[in-house]
Structures are given as structure tokens and as C-alpha cells.
Amino acid sequence: ELLSQKYSNITSNLQDKINSLIETKKNATLAIALTLAENDKTKDMIFQERNSDYDLNELSEKLKNYTDYKNVWFHIIDSSGVSVYRSWTEDKNDKIKNYRLDLQEILLNPKVKNSISVGIYDITFKSMIPIYKDEKFIGILECITHFNSITRELRNNQMLEPIILVDKLFTNQLRENSFTKIFLQDYYVANLSVSNEILKYLDSQDLEEFLKIKDYLIKDENLVINIPIMEDGVKLADMLIFQNINKLN
């Protein structure tokens, strides 16, 4: 009884900690996006004024070198829904609004949107900011960040082993261009620094047993908890956290 209470307390504390890390990252992503959307050089990029040496990739590199955010992506879309710049790839000039419902909504009714979503590259934090020039709506800036700073924090500072498994619903769309290129039993794994040991262990198990965890599970000397990653009432992924019970205080 005492032991189960202890495990319940640890689980509850971890859930609070991780939800707090997620909210912090969401807000930081929004702060970067809001600042950048006001920048005149960002606005000029919509008009393809590439003769300037302004490149958001350099900002992404600076964030990588000086902050915990190692893979910040910037995406600029014009007011007709065409992608004019992606910092992480050379791909551009595609009419992205044709396959993005969220974009169609914002182009019709420009407003700030801050969310977690799954695209063709990854599960990401995404802040979408309408851009105006001389009070005229000219496009959208997206600032996109990943879950890796959160899972690194859990591994390095909390001594936990996290793995993020994106819902099977999104597996097919992630196959070709996924950020981590890691798949486990038909699930996309979203954290680059996932432990090989955990991958091997889960590959030998019935994954569904872990994805059904409501509170916690004790198995093979591990305390395992599952934190669903939700957006607008839809489950996008499960974050499983492993902690060796022999290392618990």
C-alpha cells in the first residue's frame, strides 16, 4: 500500500513536470514567432527580395548555439497560401494551403494560433503569426520547434528515459520526410535522443500494453508512466517515461 502510494506520487509529480515543460516550450515558440513577425526583413522575404543577405537559417543556428532550442524551423507563407521559404529545406513555391486546413482558416481569418500538431516532418510546436505591411495582410510566419529539448531535459537532468510515440493515424504521412527517421512497430518515434536500450526493449514487447497505461505500470524493474500529448481533444502521441525502480529515492 505504501509502495503504491509512493509510485502514484512520483507519477503525479512527473506528469505535472512534463506538462509544465510542454507549456513552457509552447510559450517560448510563440515569443520567438511574435518577435520575428514584426521584423521588416521577414516581411520583405514574402516579396522574394532575396538580394538581401537575410537568412532565418542563421537565426536558427544562433538559437542552436546559444539556447536549448537546437532545431527551430521558420516557414513563411504568402497571403495566397504559397510557401515562399522554409529554413530546413530548399523546398518552396508549393501551394501548401491546398493540404493544410489550419492554413485555410487563418488565411480567411488572420489571427495568432499556437498549437501542437503532426505534419509530414514531425510532431511539433507551431506558432502561426499573421504578417502585415502598411496594415495590409501579406502572409504568415510559422515558427516550429520540436520535443527534443524536453526529452533531453528529462534524460540529462531528471535521469529518466522518455520515448514519444506518435499515434498510428499519422504513420503513413511521416514515412517519407520524418525528422528522426525512427519507427517502432509502425509508430513514429519523435525524440532523436531516444535510448537504444528502450527501443530494443519495447520492440520485444506488446506496445499496446504500454499505450494503455492509465496511471503507472511496474514491469521488468521499471516504473513506466504514459503522458498523452493532446490538442483540441485529439490524442497526437504518447510520451512513455521509464524510471528504474532501484534508482528511486
Language-model features, listed with the residues they occupy:
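Membrane-proximal N-terminal soluble sensing/regulatory segments of transmembrane proteins
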Residues: M45-R50, D134-L141, P162-K168
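Extracytoplasmic/periplasmic sensor domains and loops in membrane signaling proteins
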Residues: M45-K62, T67, V82, R86-S117, ...
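Conserved beta-strands of PAS-like sensory domains
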Residues: I123-N156, M230-L248
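Juxtamembrane extracytoplasmic/periplasmic/luminal helical "stalk" adjacent to the first N-terminal
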Residues: E1-Q48, N65-V72, N156, L160-P162
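Short hydrophobic alpha-helical segments used for membrane anchoring or interfacial signaling
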Residues: L34, F74-S80, P162-F170
